[in-house]
Structures are given as structure tokens and as C-alpha cells.
Amino acid sequence: MSMTRRDFVKTSFAGLPLYAALAGKIDSTVNGVRLGTITYSFRELPRTPGALDAVDVDIKALTECGIGEIELFSPDLQPRLPREDLRKWRLSTPMEHFKALRKKFEDAGIALFAYTVNFRNDFTDDELEKSFEQAKALGASIIAASTQLSVARRLVPFAERHKVYVAMHGHSNVQDPDEFSGPESFSRALAMSKYFRINLDVGHFTAANFDAVTFIRDNHDNITHLHLKDRKKNDGPNMPWGEGETPIKQVLLLLKERKYPIRAFVEYEYRGTGTPIDEVKRCMSYMRRALA
């Protein structure tokens, strides 16, 4: 039986059993709005010497920040290898490896809401298949993808076979018709598959001169989660939160007032004065104050 978008909201966004089970461990929900981060925010933190991934570093950082729900950035799970060696790693690493990583996060009280895979044209079909298998092994029902419309078409049979949702992440490049940036590009993706959704980057959307508040209000059933950053309009720079033109507070209040089950995740990209942990803490505090 096919699942409608409204059914998807009720089942996935309202809280899958895993998320509900973990809610009492690290709870980063404020007045009904579920806050978190993409682990890309911690990309500058050094890995543990000898480690092939950044999982332990991520867990320590998330615990310090009091974050209980995340989008897991796939490069954090991978050894740093040349492209062809990384392809071999993707194809040969057993799913038990990813299940073990999932358990590490679960044991730390952190729920994996989404898994980032930035699909590119050079991904083979075997790599696409493995990416969806990895998401399932990690317990993530959503893959968040920075990709292109031309690549999205290739993802349709994989998403539908695995019943894993792919949430398209946009940027501010409105000149390239193959890039996700504005409402029209997202509409084209949604028309491709019932398993396609939107991971709206509120900062990039604002920098591309679109109205994030109106878009969320009109499309909330199709939005899985938000990436929050504070950019200026006209493709302007990333700024410390509160110094740009992105309506972060208004977006958060919309989620709170309308009770939309859309996650709000920090994506730390501006040039901060502290460590990534310091800056993510500042962003989390900003959101908590906005929702108080």
C-alpha cells in the first residue's frame, strides 16, 4: 500500500520508535521543536589519532552541546582516501560495520534522523545501492542529499525499492538549472517520486532571495528538516547568527506555533571565533532563546 505525504508526516516526523526510545537520553527539544545539528558542523575537529572515522569525536562534541538528534554526515564515517579507494571502501565494507556505528550513537543517547550522502554523477549504480543499504543499517529513514536534478532521476528506483526517503538539499546557485535552489527546482524533484522530500537550507534559500517562512508554511508536508545558518541576501556571506538576513527566529516560531514536526538542525559554516563546539553551542543557545 502506498503512503501519502500526510501519512509520512504522521509516521516519520511524529517520531519513529527509535527516536521515541531515545528521547529521554539527550533531549534537545524546546517547546515542541526538535533541535539538532548536521555533524558536518564539526568537520574541523581533528580525528582521534589512528581512527578511520570521526564517530567518537562527533559523539563527544554532540554530548558537550547537549544535542540528541542529528543528520550524520557520511564523510565522518569514511577513511580519508583517494576517490577510487573510497569507492572500493564503500562497496566492500559490510553493513555490520554501520550497524555497530549506529549502536555507538544509540548508546550515547543520540538518534540518527538522517544520513547525508552527496550523490554525484560519478557514483556507480553499485555505490548508490550501497548508500541506501548504509542508511538502513544506520537506522536512518531519510537520506539528505546535496545533489543535482540530473542525478536525482537516477535515485528514484533505489529510493522506491528500499523505501528510504531522499530529502533534497538546496544551495543559492540560481543560475544552474541542474542545481536545487528555489521552489521550482524542489517541485520538479517532488514530481519524480513519492519518496522525494525537501531538506530546506534556510540560509541558502534566503541568500537566493526566496522567502523561507512562506515556503515552509506552504510546503511543510514535504519538508523533513531544516539546515539553519544566517546568510545575507543576494548570495551574501555566512554570518554569525543574528548578523545576517536569514529569518531564523521567525522560522523557529513558525515551527513552534504551527506544531510542524520539522527538525531544525544547525549547520555551522560561518567563520567563528571559537572552536566548532563553542560555535554550535552558541547556535543552539540562539535557537533555545528564540523558542523560549
At which residue positions do the language-model features occur?
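N-terminal pre-domain/capping segments
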Residues: 2-142, 160-167, 172, 221, ...
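Active-site beta-loop-alpha junctions enriched in small/polar residues
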Residues: 40-42, 73-75, 117-120, 148, ...
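Short, solvent-exposed loop/turn segments at secondary-structure boundaries
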Residues: 46-51, 126, 177-180, 211, ...
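Extracytoplasmic/secreted envelope proteins and their assembly/folding machinery
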Residues: 59, 132, 152, 183-187, ...
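Active-site-adjacent beta->alpha loops and helix N-cap segments on the catalytic face
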Residues: 149-158
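Acidic/histidine-rich catalytic cores of soluble enzymes
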Residues: 159-245, 249-252
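H/E-rich (His + Asp/Glu) clusters that bind or coordinate divalent metals
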Residues: 241-268, 281-282, 292
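Substrate-binding clefts and catalytic carboxylate motifs of secreted carbohydrate-active enzymes
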Residues: 269, 273-274, 286
